[in-house]
Amino acid sequence: MEILIIKDKIQPKQRPRFWKGKVFTPSQTKSSEKRIAQEYKRQCKTFFTGKVEMGIRLYVGVKNKKQWGEPCLSHFDCDNTLKTICDSLNNVAYTDDSQVYKISAQKIYAPFYYTIIKIK
């Protein structure tokens, strides 16, 4: 099992953009994917070859202390953020995100943005 900690907000996956007949990924999404891949290489060593299971906790930074630890029902879509995480780990933690057969995710209020990703 590997545990990856990202100490920043992860950009949810954005729709592809079209310009002059070409398709491209927005720069915010690309930079977020690159940062996650770099952090995985720095913090973790395992390359998974079989089935992959992921547990993800997305901590959303808010100033109100009363909300800390509570489920977050606003801000960004959880599924788009999961897509960014899974895509960024292609050829880094596993060959392709099609190997991921089970994902559990939580979005929780916290004092600052960070993400904990468990992969097994």
PLM ranges: what are they?
Residues 1-120:
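Acidic, proline/glycine-enriched N-terminal capping motif
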